[in-house]
């Protein structure tokens, strides 16, 4: 298991704060572990929480426009 996957597994099990009581999914990251850049969002929105994926809601659409 890579360090990245170990961190993901730790996040999936985390109950260190009250967010664990209200979240639907842990929103981790997607993409290559050896990517040259990483984009980190402030906090997942409702759509990200529902799907368990980062940047799929309105903020993600704005990010897509900004990166074009």
Where are these predicted regions, by residue range?
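A polyanion-binding, active-site-adjacent surface
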Residues: 1-68
